Amino acid sequence: MIRKVLAEELKNLDVYLPDLGCTVGEELLRPTRIYVKPLLHVIGEFGKDIKGISHITGGGFYENVPRMLPNGVRARIEVKKIPEKPIFNLLAQKGSIPVRDMYNTFNMGVGLVIAVSANRKSAVAGALRAQGETPIVLGQCERGEKGVDLVW
C-alpha cells in the first residue's frame, strides 16, 4: 500500500515537511525500534504477569493483537490513547486510505503491545520507563470472542 501512495502521490521524497521535521524519505527510512533489551528485562522481572506480547507489523492491530490472545479473550484498544504520528496522517490523506485500513496495515507508531495482569500494569509500565521506553496503557482485555476492537 505504501508503495502505491509513494508512486502515485508522494513522488518527491526529498521534500521537507515541517509536520515531520524532516523529509518524507528520511521519515520512511527511520530505523525500526528494537525492543529486545527492555522486553527481556520486563520478562525477567514480571514473567508470570505477562499474558501476551505482540510485535505490531504488517497486518496492524487487527491481525497481530489477536495472535497473542487465548480463545475467549478480546482486546479493547482505545485509539485516542495512541499518539498521532504525522507520517501516518500524510499517508492516509495522500493515499485516500480509510482509517480502518490504516490500523489494519500499519502499526500507527505502536511497535509492541504487551498484555499484563491488570494489577501489575503500573509496575510493568514503570519498569519499561526505567529502560527508556514510553509505555502507554492502550486498553484492556475482556471475555469475548478472540479478537480486537479498536474504539474511537
PLM features: what roles do these ranges have?
Residues 8, 12-29, 33-152:
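Glycine-/charge-enriched secondary-structure boundary and capping motifs
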